[in-house]
Amino acid sequence: MRKQLEEARKLSPVELEKLVREKKRELMELRFQASIGQLSQNHKIRDLKRQIARLLTVLNEKRRQNA
């Protein structure tokens, strides 16, 4: 987890936005699977939401530094 955060801090804001969009798409797919009963590992939704929050935090930090 710490490595992922360090890697995210190395990315540019544009790359971070792209990664957030990809993760949100994954979250949408997981929610769909959960709604039709195909998802057996419900913790993946929570983990993915936390990843998105971390990425958004890093993105906001970068935006504040550039402002």
Curated annotation (Swiss-Prot):
Coiled coil region boundaries: none
Statement: the UniProt record of this protein carries the keyword Ribosomal protein: yes
GO CC term, one of those recorded: cytosolic large ribosomal subunit
Record key words, sorted: Ribonucleoprotein, Ribosomal protein
GO biological process: translation
Gene Ontology molecular functions: structural constituent of ribosome
SUPFAM superfamilies listed in its UniProt record: Ribosomal protein L29 (L29p)
HAMAP family given in the database record: Ribosomal_uL29 (MF_00374)
Record family assignment: Belongs to the universal ribosomal protein uL29 family.
Protein name, as recorded: Large ribosomal subunit protein uL29
Provenance organism: Thermus thermophilus
